[in-house]
Amino acid sequence: MQKPIIEFRNVSKKFGNKTPISKVSFIVKKNNITTLIGPNGAGKTTIVRLMLGLEKPTSGEVIIDRKLKIGYVPQKFGLTTDIPITVKKFLDLLAPSHFNKNIKEISSFIDLEHIKKQEISKLSGGQFQKVVLACSIINNPDLIILDEPLQSLDVTSQQEFYQLIHFIRKKLNITVFMISHDLFTVIKNSDQVICLNGHICCSGVPHEITPNSEFSNALSSLGFYTHNHDHKH
């Protein structure tokens, strides 16, 4: 059995009197797309901060290979969209000199060639997300963590974004860990789904989310309604 790229073992985290996550256990398999879903305040941000080493667990273990390279795209990227800089110059600034040779290949992967001369301020929401995705893979990571990457994107842009995620995962052999609120697109595009609400409510593969299943009932109790969609993956 292949060793997981990340493993949480009975992890709890306290901040003063608050315990955002309690006794959380799960694994992230190499080269899979794993999606974490849950309501606001469920502890999703705490999970990401533990993965990135920004926090240490109060109890339990977070097991990550020290050599693992991680690309991270936060929910709020922190890039002002009105800066007067082109897409190409922006990516060149981000990449260390020995990675500059990869810029053209990455731009081709993410379909940025036709917009590389445009200013950041002129990009649509979907185009901007492609730039953000390029930022996350520019240094050849083993794992990318995407925090709500589909937020504010229309349906077409969401579909295009997932197509790129699948392409990058296959082409570059990158593992993807994503946070999302959109259960329908998650079911269609993930290898593993983890539902969090301070603890792990349910976890499994998308085809297990069938009407009246334990997985489906747990999701429904948190407001994720599953019975109106075709869930074939």
Curated annotation (Swiss-Prot):
It is a peripheral membrane protein. Residues 6-222 form the ABC transporter domain. ATP binds at residues 38-45. SMART domains: AAA. One of its GO terms (molecular function) is ATP binding. Keywords: ATP-binding, Cell inner membrane, Cell membrane, Ion transport, Membrane, Nucleotide-binding, Translocase, Transport, Zinc, Zinc transport. One of its GO terms (biological process) is response to zinc ion. It catalyses: Zn(2+)(out) + ATP(in) + H2O(in) = Zn(2+)(in) + ADP(in) + phosphate(in) + H(+)(in). Its EC number is 7.2.2.20. Disulfide bonds: none annotated. One of its GO terms (cellular component) is plasma membrane. It comes from the Bacteria. It is found in: Cell inner membrane. The keyword Ubl conjugation does not apply. It holds the Pfam family ABC_tran. InterPro entries: AAA+_ATPase (IPR003593), ABC_transporter-like_ATP-bd (IPR003439), ABC_transporter-like_CS (IPR017871), Metal_Ion_Import_ABC (IPR050153), P-loop_NTPase (IPR027417). PANTHER family: METAL TRANSPORT SYSTEM ATP-BINDING PROTEIN TM_0124-RELATED, ZINC IMPORT ATP-BINDING PROTEIN ZNUC. The complex is composed of two ATP-binding proteins (ZnuC), two transmembrane proteins (ZnuB) and a solute-binding protein (ZnuA). Part of the ABC transporter complex ZnuABC involved in zinc import. Responsible for energy coupling to the transport system. Belongs to the ABC transporter superfamily. Zinc importer (TC 3.A.1.15.5) family. This is Zinc import ATP-binding protein ZnuC. It comes from Rickettsia prowazekii (strain Madrid E). The lineage of its organism: Bacteria, Pseudomonadati, Pseudomonadota, Alphaproteobacteria, Rickettsiales.
